[in-house]
Structures are given as C-alpha cells and as structure tokens.
C-alpha cells in the first residue's frame, strides 16, 4: 500500500508519522548527534519570521514532510541571490546524509530538499553582513544579481555599501525603479555624473514614475544639456499613455484597452553598461491585462507534470529504501544465527568435556572472528584472560584488545612485557606499539622504581626523540637535564630539582661534547650545596674537560677557596681521567638515555596528576613541543588523562595547541573522542578559548565534531556547534 496517496484530514499517513517522530525528543536528539551531514556549505534566504510554508525553523536539523509542496530551496552562495525573490536573513545550509527519506532535487535550475541543517544567520539588511559574505567568496562586482536583489528589497545601507566597493550602480537604479523604491534611487545617485542621472531619469519614465522624473529633469537640466529635449518628449508620451489608460477605466468599459504610444517611443530602450562586458537592454512595453485561457491551461498542465515527476521520483526512492532495509535486516539475522551457532557449539563442547578450556585453536578462532560473546563465555569458564589478551595482540585484533582491557580488566602491562621478550615482537610491532600507547595513557610508569625499567620503553624505540630538550640550548650542546639544572642554578636554588632528577635515575657522571660533567657546571655557578650533594653520591671530580680542567681546577681559577677546601676534603683515591670526545662513547649513550628518561618522567607526572613535577621540569628548561614516536605531545597525553591544570600549564608554556599526531589527531580531537569516559567539557572549552581549530581533519578525514557525534556527550557537541557557527 502506497502511504503517500492515502489522505487523512488533509495529511498523508507519512505526514502524520513524520510529525510524531519529530515530536519525539529522544529521536530528535539521536538525529542531532548521529546524523552525519555534508561538509559543503550551501545557503538559503528566509523571511523575517524565518518560516517555510508557515512552519517556523531554527538552527539545527529541520525536517519537512515528503510532500513536494513542503520543501526548502538552497544553493551555493554565488547563485542564491539569482533565484530568491524576497527575504531578510541568509542562513548556512548543510545537507544531512544517511537519514531515511531525505531527498534533494533540481527544478528549473533551482535545488530543493526536505531536510536541512541550518547554521549561522546573516542579516541581509546590514552592510557589514556583505563584508563577511565577500570574505566567504561572494562576488558582488561581476555578478549583478546581488546589487539587483538588495535594490529590489530597498535595503539602502547595503546597496550603498555594495556600490562603494564597485557594484554596478546602473543595475541598482534599474531594480529600484522597477520595484518602486524611489527613495533608494535618490540616496545613491551622483548629482555630478551625467550618465547616472540620465539612466535614473530614463528608468523612472519607463516605469511611470513621472513626477519624480520630471523633477529630476528640472533639477539637472544644465547637466543633461541637449538630452533634456529627448527626455521631455519621452516623458510627455508616457504621460499621455497614463491619462488614456485612466480615461478608459473610468468609462466603465468591461475590458481594459491597451494604451498606444507614439511611434517615436513605442519601443523605447535604455542601455545600461555592466562591467564593460555586457549590456542590459530594457525593452519597456505596456503589459497585457489579461492572460488567455490557453496560457492558463498550459501553465496548469506544466504544474501537473512537475508534480507527477516528483511523485514518481518519490516512489522510486521509497522502493530503493525498502529494498536496502530488507537486505540489511536479512544480513543482521544471518550474522546473529552464525554467532548463536558458534556459541551453542562452544557451550556444548564445554559441557561435554566438563574441564577447563585449553584448546588454543578455539580461542584463536573466537579472537579472529572478534566474537566477544564467545570470549565472555571462555572467561566465565575460567580461561586465563591474560592469555586471551596475548593471543589478541599477536593476531593484531585491536577491538578485542580494547574490549579485554576496558571491560574485563586484563593485565596489559604484563602482556606488554611478555610481548617485548617474545619472538612475536618484530612480527607484530604495530600491536606492541598500540599496547604501549595504552600503557602511557594509564600511568605506565606508576610502579616503576628501577631506572633500567623506565628506560626499557625508550630502548624499544617507541619514542624517536625526547619530549623534553633544554630550551635556549641547541641540539649540539648535548646537555643532560642535571647539567642544565646545575648550569642554571644560582646560590643552590636548583638543589631540589637536582635531587629529583637524580631520584629518577639520571647519570651524574654524564659528559657533554666539551667534556664537562654536572660537577663542572655546579662549580662555575659556585653552588656549594649541589657540589656537596654530587660528591656525596660519588660524582667523579677527576674528569678533565676539553681544556684540560677538572672541577677542582675551575674552583682554583676562580679563587674560590671555600670550594677548594671542599674538594680537598674528599679522599684522593681516584685517578684523573683525561678529556675525551663523547661521540660514540658510553657517556654519549648515558646522555641519550638521560634525555629519553626526561620524557618518561613527564609522562609519568601527567598520568599521576603531579602538577608540581611537570611545572619544575618545564621551569628547568625542557622543550614542551617535542613529540614521541606516535607524534603525540605532552598536551595530547594531558588531555587523554583529563588533567585540566596540566593542560593549562602546557598551553601557557607555548605548546602548539593544534599539533597533530601520526593519525592526524589534535588534542581537541582526543578530548572529543574520549569524552564518554569522563566529562571533558572544561578541557574542550579551554582548548576552544585558546584557538583550538574545530575543522582540522585527521587522516581518516574526520574532524573533532565528527568524533564527538559518536560519544553522546550533548554538552560538548552543542559547544562545538556554537563555536563553529560563531567562527563561520
């Protein structure tokens, strides 16, 4: 049964269904959040009440009935003024996709649709609106439709602005005269330009605004010169025509008689230049007052044909939707049947064996097919969940990995370590890295106490470069964080930082490219307490730098007797070590490990929400903008871990807020992607307030708002839409 053709109280059954659906708030919210829409922006022009077919519309998704009379016209910015007669507000239009019964069509070169997402609103009466539209690509100079439209609407300020930037004033005069907007003509004409005055007078005579035309001829007679005679003749001819028409109407004749013009002016034409390339020829004739029956019949027949064409199109689309829906339902049932069969067989096998499952092939089959129901059953029967996670990793099934970690509490750290030591490490390198990223976001260094264990991730090359390198020092300086702290310290003010760095396992005997150690830099800064601390830890004060100086020699050169006494109090049982290059040496390795360890410290501090630790590391001169192996910055990590204070600290320290990782994702995208886990509204709002860009695309061609639509966080979604509307 075709529901479109069965009417009830003036409505089709489908109209009634759509009304009920639209009134359902849950369904409306689902559409707003879930319905993808085209990224291409169109426009439409609405009246002052913003109604379509007497139905109010507003920002967001607007759904009309499928009846062809209830539709909205839209088009590109440079075409919309050509096809729209009247209006006050220009609206952004986006087309929803993947929504059943959405359609669009083109009739007489105009585009129509029954569903739109309305965006930003522009007031076409204001001149500043056109400044924005020109920035969006509106051509107001070569396209005369814009100036013609504003003059027709009698928008004086807008028309004057367009003329001031080069729009065609003659087109404005013609349009204003045609639609009787005489005050607009008076406000835009230039009293010193003969060509403009001549155009205005001819247009007003042609459109029978005879009183104003006569007044203008009188005022500008000196400027018009010899043209006055021709204009006066044209004016008198049209005056007689008007009087003749009035006389005919007053005689009570049942039919109006077409007034006759003199031969001289019957086909009077006014030529108006358009951008030196085209000419508008206005042939003004008196219109017939009646339309013949034949023309009315023809128009009616045309309208019926259009209606039938749309009706056929509607039926075709409905059939397609029904066929596609049926195929999808059949496929879902088929998959459910297969899944139930597998689960039943597995349960039967478990029941018969009555023992714990040890068949790895069965587990692998469930993992490869990503059958989470089967895996749940296996776990309930006592199968080792960490072994399932291990098998999921070597089979590169990331959906299963996420499910086991997020929902079943699998020990991902244990499995990660097992993978690093196994033969599968290089074969499944991408999965191992994926697990490492999960460890980073879940405080992977939280229980680590051994420096070698901290550095293990760096040795596996998950991070190509250190996240923190001293600022103000080039890469060639090769200074470790402890060296930086000692060099920057004055009166031992960095002692606490040095102690913290030592506690994290930095090598106090590392040497830079000029052969100096942390002790050399501490002596240069006369930091007695730091020197005492380093010597107590066994720092080697016998190292010579490239100039042949030991730390003690530097103290002697500076005549610092207090430091000399300090060095002389240390037992002299060590041999002076000559200077050496650090390239390809153990010191170079230690230095690189120290710098990589700095990255681990920062990540650990973020994961543990240790604001003060991150602050101290940044104050010591670490570069906040470097990236790890996945091209993530500290800001990415702080956003994922929902640390607002650390996010604020990093942004205020100059980190790139729109930096993209190897998947093309920005910190804003990650905040949107993980917003279902905990509320990240404050972080999203802070990022947006600091110029985070919404429309940057990741490598999968998705933006932050696309990722947001999958998490059902309505507050963040509305915030993104609001900012997007303001910025565009």
Curated annotation (Swiss-Prot):
PROSITE patterns: ANK_REP_REGION, ANK_REPEAT. ANK repeats lie at residues 142-171, 173-198, 358-383, 384-414, 477-510, 514-543, 547-576, 594-626, 630-659, 663-696. It comes from the Viruses. Residues 244-271 are annotated as: Disordered. Keywords: ANK repeat, Coiled coil, Repeat. Residues 292-338 form a coiled coil. InterPro entries: Ankyrin_rpt (IPR002110), Ankyrin_rpt-contain_sf (IPR036770), Multifunctional_ANK_Repeat (IPR051165). It holds the Pfam family Ank_2. Residues 244-267 have a biased composition (Low complexity). This is Putative ankyrin repeat protein L271. It comes from Acanthamoeba polyphaga mimivirus (APMV). The lineage of its organism: Viruses, Varidnaviria, Bamfordvirae, Nucleocytoviricota, Megaviricetes.
């Amino acid at each position: 049964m075709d529901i479109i053709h069965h009417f009830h109280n003036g409505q089709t059954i489908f109209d009634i269904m759509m009304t009920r659906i639209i009134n359902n708030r849950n369904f409306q919210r689902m559409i707003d959040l879930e319905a993808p829409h085209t990224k291409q922006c169109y426009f439409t022009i609405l009246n002052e009440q913003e109604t379509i077919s007497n139905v109010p519309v507003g920002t967001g998704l607007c759904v009309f009935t499928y009846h062809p009379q209830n539709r909205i016209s839209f088009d590109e910015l440079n075409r919309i003024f050509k096809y729209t007669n009247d209006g006050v507000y220009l609206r952004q239009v986006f087309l929803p996709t993947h929504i059943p019964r959405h359609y669009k069509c083109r009739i007489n070169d105009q585009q129509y649709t029954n569903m739109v997402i309305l965006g930003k609103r522009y007031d076409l009466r204001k001149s500043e609106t056109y400044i924005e539209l020109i920035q969006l690509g509106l051509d107001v100079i070569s396209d005369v439709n814009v100036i013609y439209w504003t003059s027709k609407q009698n928008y004086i300020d807008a028309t004057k602005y367009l003329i001031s930037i080069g729009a065609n004033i003659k087109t404005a005069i013609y349009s204003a005269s045609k639609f009787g907007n005489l005050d607009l003509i008076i406000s835009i004409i230039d009293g010193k330009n003969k060509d403009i005055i001549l155009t205005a007078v001819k247009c007003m005579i042609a459109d029978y605004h005879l009183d104003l035309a006569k007044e203008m001829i009188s005022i500008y007679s000196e400027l018009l010169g010899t043209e006055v005679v021709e204009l006066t003749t044209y004016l008198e001819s049209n005056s007689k025509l008007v009087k003749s028409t009035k006389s005919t109407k007053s005689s009570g004749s049942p039919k109006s008689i077409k007034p006759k013009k003199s031969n001289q002016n019957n086909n009077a034409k006014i030529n108006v230049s358009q951008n030196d390339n085209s000419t508008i020829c206005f042939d003004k004739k008196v219109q017939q007052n009646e339309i013949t029956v034949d023309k009315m019949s023809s128009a009616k027949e045309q309208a019926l044909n259009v209606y039938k064409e749309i009706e056929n199109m509607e039926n075709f689309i409905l059939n397609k939707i029904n066929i596609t829906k049926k195929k999808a339902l059949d496929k879902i049932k088929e998959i459910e049947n297969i899944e139930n069969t597998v689960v039943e067989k597995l349960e039967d096998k478990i029941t018969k064996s009555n023992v714990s499952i040890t068949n790895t092939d069965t587990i692998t089959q469930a993992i490869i097919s990503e059958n989470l129901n089967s895996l749940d059953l296996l776990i309930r029967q006592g199968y080792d969940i960490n072994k399932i996670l291990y098998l999921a990793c070597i089979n590169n099934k990331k959906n299963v990995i996420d499910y086991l970690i997020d929902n079943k509490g699998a020990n991902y750290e244990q499995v990660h370590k097992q993978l690093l030591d196994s033969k599968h490490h290089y074969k499944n390198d991408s999965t191992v890295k994926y697990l490492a990223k999960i460890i980073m976001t879940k405080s992977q260094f939280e229980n680590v106490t051994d420096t070698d264990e901290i550095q293990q991730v760096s040795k596996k090359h998950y991070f190509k470069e250190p996240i923190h390198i001293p600022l103000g020092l080039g890469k060639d300086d090769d200074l470790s964080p402890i060296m930086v702290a000692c060099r920057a310290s004055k009166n031992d003010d960095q002692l606490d930082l040095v102690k913290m760095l030592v506690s994290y396992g930095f090598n106090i005997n590392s040497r830079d490219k000029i052969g100096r150690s942390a002790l050399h830099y501490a002596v240069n800064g006369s930091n007695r307490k730091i020197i005492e601390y380093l010597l107590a830890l066994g720092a080697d004060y016998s190292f010579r730098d490239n100039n042949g100086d030991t730390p003690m020699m530097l103290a002697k050169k500076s005549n610092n007797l207090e430091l000399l006494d300090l060095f002389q109090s240390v037992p002299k049982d060590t041999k002076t070590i000559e200077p050496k290059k650090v390239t390809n040496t153990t010191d170079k390795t230690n230095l690189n490990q120290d710098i990589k360890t700095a990255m681990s410290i920062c990540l650990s501090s973020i994961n543990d929400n240790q604001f003060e630790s991150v602050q101290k590391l940044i104050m010591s001169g670490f570069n906040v903008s470097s990236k790890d192996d996945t091209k993530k910055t500290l800001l990415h990590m702080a956003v994922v871990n929902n640390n607002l204070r650390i996010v604020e600290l990093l942004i205020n320290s100059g980190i790139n807020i729109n930096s993209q990782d190897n998947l093309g994702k920005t910190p804003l995208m990650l905040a949107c992607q993980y917003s279902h886990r905990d509320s990240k509204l404050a972080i999203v709002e802070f990022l947006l307030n600091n110029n985070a860009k919404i429309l940057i695309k990741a490598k999968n061609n998705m933006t932050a708002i696309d990722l947001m639509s999958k998490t059902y966080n309505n507050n963040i979604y509305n915030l993104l839409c609001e900012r997007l509307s303001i910025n565009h």
